[in-house]
Curated annotation (Swiss-Prot):
Gene3D superfamilies documented for this protein: P-loop containing nucleotide triphosphate hydrolases (3.40.50.300)
Example GO biological process: dTTP biosynthetic process
Classification via Pfam families: Thymidylate_kin
EC number: 2.7.4.9
Top-level taxon in the UniProt lineage: Bacteria
Function: Phosphorylation of dTMP to form dTDP in both de novo and salvage pathways of dTTP synthesis.
PANTHER family registered for this protein in UniProt: THYMIDYLATE KINASE, UMP-CMP KINASE 2, MITOCHONDRIAL
Designated name of the protein: Thymidylate kinase
Source organism (scientific name): Mycoplasma capricolum subsp. capricolum (strain California kid / ATCC 27343 / NCTC 10154)
Amino acid sequence: MFITFEGMDGSGKTTALLKVKEELERLNYKVLITREPGGEVIAEQIRQIILDNKNKDMDAWTEALLFIASRNQHLQKVIKPALEKNIIVISDRFIDSTSAYQGSARNIGVDVVSEVQQIVLKNCLPDLTLFFDVSFSEAEKRMQIRGESSKNRLDKEENNFKQKVYQGYLELVKNNPKRIKVIDANKDIDQVYNQAIKIILEKLKENEKRTSN
């Protein structure tokens, strides 16, 4: 099964991901956690270009295509091989990030970005996506705890950009209700984790029941 975690920076999705992995392994599932942009040697090199604070003048389409190129490398060399071995893959970000950040916030258009991704990635969709929905104030507070030094080029965007990203995510949730489930990420990490693992275990049980029939 292929699961993706999505949300604004500071939503707590990465912390929850690690706790989910630990619990699934305790239940004897084989799990691979990975991230985007990156997750593979060449994809990580592309990540450095995308997030480098020096690259402030990057064109919106250049940015989008770099994300998609990194994603395809990650998909072909890491995600697909793991799925073929019946390993549960959980990725910190995937296609919906590019739709929200570049399609919505960079004003390229969600539909256009989705079309390009479908062509390049051959319609590869996650089985389940969790959107970690957090308020701007809570996300900012968590980002401050992480420290300014941890901020990359996209973290440093203005609030107007982040608002567009958020609206992009809400639109994706609205248009993909079967795949994308919402997590209330304003709660403490244990409550956030409990929401996430409940949905994931239900999906796993559903898949296992379908396979056995």
